[in-house]
């Protein structure tokens, strides 16, 4: 074999070995996500589709659940490595009961996506009309639950909180009169509002205590954090890179449209509805307010101590 031919063969072999090594280096992470199709909760899915997590040596296996409390339980049990978009009140309450979980990042600051609505034919037209009515939230301990409790407290309502599961299931229950007031999260249901089928009564921005604090978090379990800290660091970096990409590249909207199956007119509005700064992951905002709301909502009997907070908040950078 000539030297030129040998060089060509060796180069080809190097490419094959390099490709295999790249494939071998992809580390699996199991991630639980609530409310399939949501913009903010879709970071892991979109980053996976856009190749960003792969660039950081990660291959995500994604499980969709109804709401954050389910994903927290999956992380506690060890069947999932990470839970994203879990309600911070549920995370705090679960930790306070001794669960081996750690918060690794903020997922949403404020609640610009959250809203409550009634069918267009309903006599409910303002927040005060919630009195004596059943008002939906997903699952106990979710961010929609904590948000509703804060709304009730702020406006001194006698509303009846009612668990309705997913946003899609809630729409069905609200439109058929099984519950008086539904909850939603943008961009879900906005097409119904534009078509005049539902009336949005209030949003998360109407709840003062939610405006500047973290409402949802990403978390893992102690075992995963201790044994795979470098992996969690790479996850956080890929996650942050994905958020930046979602707000800068039209390709992200294309992926989101395919993922969410939402009408194009809604997909195009999504980045205006949820500002990029609300999805900052490197800090948990409003700790004092988080503690106050968690106590008021009976998620914890008393605020966590500084030592407990130091143990719970483990934002790997």
Range-by-range predicted roles:
Residues 225-300:
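Secondary-structure end/capping motifs
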Residues 292-317:
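Conserved C-terminal helix/tail region of periplasmic/extracytoplasmic solute-binding proteins
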């Amino acid at each position: 074999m000539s030297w030129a031919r040998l060089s060509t063969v060796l180069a080809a072999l190097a490419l094959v070995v390099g490709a295999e090594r790249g494939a071998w280096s992809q580390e699996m992470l199991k991630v639980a996500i609530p409310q399939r199709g949501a913009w903010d909760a879709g970071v892991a899915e979109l980053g996976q589709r856009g190749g960003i997590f792969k660039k950081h040596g990660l291959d995500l296996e994604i499980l969709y659940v109804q709401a954050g409390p389910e994903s927290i339980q999956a992380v506690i049990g060890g069947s999932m490595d990470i839970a994203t978009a879990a309600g911070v009140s549920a995370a705090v309450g679960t930790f306070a009961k001794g669960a081996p979980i750690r918060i690794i990042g903020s997922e949403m600051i404020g609640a610009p996506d959250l809203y409550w609505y009634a069918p267009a034919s309903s006599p409910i037209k303002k927040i005060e009309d919630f009195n004596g009515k059943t008002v939906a939230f997903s699952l106990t301990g979710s961010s929609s639950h904590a948000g509703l409790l804060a709304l009730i407290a702020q406006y001194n309502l006698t509303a009846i909180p009612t668990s309705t599961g997913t946003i899609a299931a809630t729409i069905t229950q609200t439109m058929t009169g099984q519950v008086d007031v539904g909850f939603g999260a943008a961009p879900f249901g906005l097409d119904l509002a534009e078509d005049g089928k539902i009336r949005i009564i209030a949003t998360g921005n109407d709840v003062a205590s939610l405006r500047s604090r973290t409402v949802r978090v990403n978390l893992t379990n102690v075992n995963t954090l201790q044994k795979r800290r470098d992996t969690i660091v790479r996850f956080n970096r890929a996650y942050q890179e994905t958020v930046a990409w979602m707000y800068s590249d039209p390709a992200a909207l294309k992926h989101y449209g395919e993922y969410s199956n939402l009408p194009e007119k809604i997909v195009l509005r999504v980045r205006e509805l949820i500002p990029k700064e609300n999805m900052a992951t490197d800090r948990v905002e409003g700790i004092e307010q988080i503690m106050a709301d968690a106590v008021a909502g009976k998620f914890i009997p008393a605020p966590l101590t500084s030592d407990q907070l130091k143990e719970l908040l483990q934002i790997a950078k």
